[in-house]
Amino acid sequence: NRIVCPTSNNHVLILRATDENGNVLPEFEKLLDIDIKAAAEAALGKTLEQNLLSVVFDYDGNLWFATGGFRIYPQREQQGVIGYIAHAAIDAILRGEQANLSEAVFVHELTPGEGAENGIAASKDGAVILTNLNCYLLRAEDGVRVVWCTPYESAGAKVSGEGDKTTGGGLAWGGGCSPTLTPNLVMFTDNQDTVNLLALDMKTGEVAASHPVLDDLPEGYQVAVENSAIVYDNGEGTVSTIVCNWFGAGSAGLADPNNDSSIQSYANIYDINWLTKGNVMIAPGVERVDTVKTADGYEMKSIWCRNDLSDTSILKLSTATGYIYGYVQDLNTGMWQYIILDFETGETVFTMDVSNKYGYNNMAIGMYAGNSG
């Protein structure tokens, strides 16, 4: 019942937000404050030229972290790192004790120019981190053990060109899609000119299956899948993945060599025309692809694709209702609205305007479903 948050100055904080009776505190209490970048530099023996981007706990309570940003150019050769803070040290600090971080922070040095571009995932097998160049499965074993490292392909940073209906671009240089896990597979997209959904074997890191996605859009649109995909494993051999196009959101300023794409402000990472004109400046595309277990391995097939929707909310699936929940803009009326899609067919089953006025762009804030429904 504590809040764990990375900060823009490379620290990680653990905060107490409620008292012993569950009442929200008027001012959160800071229980832990670690300068991760400084600790990682000490462990690495080098200066890091990337900032802290993401953190996640693994199943043993170790806190994994990765440096990077929303667009990491390999040719700039900035030094980055992935690593973890040992569970025992975190517990000691929370008990009010001193912890020697030189014996509790472990790192894996990345090739200069390599860095994370989104979130980290964790399972009982370890922590999965997707950088702009590779996908890793890592384990904490008194140091960072690289169980496997699988490279993937990217066309590099994508930007709008002549004839495009957008002015922005993609956010990431590489895949940009936070990996999503099943017990047996790691799911993410690459960033080739035709984007592919990849399924990696959790045990070996080998590509078990792949399939092109969002490859039949109207003229004038490119593809960049920048958010964590929805992944649903039905437990009977079928894994369904929902991918959503995000091309057009990225600011042209991300190409500036002096830009720090780890700073997550609207002005820094998002296209000004999307911020001011709305979803007409975002490329459409939402697609469901199923990965099916066969006698010989896995095969993928497209189930449905919506080339008329531009979603900005990071779609959410409710397995209880069988609906996908999103937030879009009606491009005819200009009104922002909630939208519900049928998981099986992709058809729209419900929309509701949030207002009768303009200006309700949710600016990429994710959808959340409470346990009350």
Describe each model-derived feature in a short phrase:
Residues 8-60, 66-121, 158-166:
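Asp-box/WD-like beta-propeller blade repeats and closely related beta-sheet repeat scaffolds
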